[in-house]
Amino acid sequence: MAAAAAAGSLLLCLLGLALPGSALHTKGSVPLDTITFYKVIPKHKFVLVKFDTQYPYGEKQDEFKKLAESSGSSEDLLVAEVGISDYGDKLNTELGEKYKLDKEKYPIFYLFHDGDFDNPLPYSGHIKAGAIQRWLKSNGIYLGMPGCLKEYDVLASKFMSVTDKSERQSLLKKGQQSLEKAKETEKKSAEQYLKIMSKILEQGEEFAANEVVRITKLIEKTKMSDGK
């Protein structure tokens, strides 16, 4: 199942404990308060901030954890979170008021660009790691999926955007040349990119569509077997 999921990710690329006064820390995410919020955001090109209860849990928080851990693949993006409590010490309520946040709609995601505090871009889609990743990508942010490589993502994007066979052959050759310089830890993933690109060159666009169907069925079959 793991191998199928990894192959699926590459194909799609082609197409603690709480401290007093802070929210629970999530790996890959930076906890912010009313002071650090204004210090940290201007230092990064993009900052995705999750506004939530002080101690979030459940399925949506699990999706956020996946997203935060995957953010290490982006040089331009910082993932952060603000825990808001409207009782007791009433932590970070000023930020909730500033952005007119409805606690019934938590978690709420805002994307800040170039330190602009007044015009953040709100996310209104499903709280799923993959959906948020696609939204970030649509806003010009690179955020690789597991097993993906930025250099080959760019190459694959160019490959899929052209239809001329000679142009595709040229891009494939470029990828093969880059493979020789790739780190040992990246070679296996790079080879998968080249393998898929070669298949598309030989068989056409139908290969990608058929492969998605095949891998999806394989994953579903494995899940059914595991559930027995």
Curated annotation (Swiss-Prot):
Assigned keywords, A-Z: Endoplasmic reticulum
GO cellular component: endoplasmic reticulum; endoplasmic reticulum lumen
A biological process term (GO) from this entry: protein secretion
Subcellular location: Endoplasmic reticulum lumen
A Pfam family hit: ERp29_N
Gene3D superfamilies, alphabetized: Endoplasmic reticulum resident protein 29, C-terminal domain, Glutaredoxin
Function text: Does not seem to be a disulfide isomerase. Plays an important role in the processing of secretory proteins within the endoplasmic reticulum (ER), possibly by participating in the folding of proteins in the ER.
Assembly and oligomerization: Homodimer.
Protein name in UniProt: Endoplasmic reticulum resident protein 29
Source organism (scientific name): Gallus gallus (Chicken)
Lineage of source species: Eukaryota, Metazoa, Chordata, Craniata, Vertebrata
This protein's encoding gene: ERP29
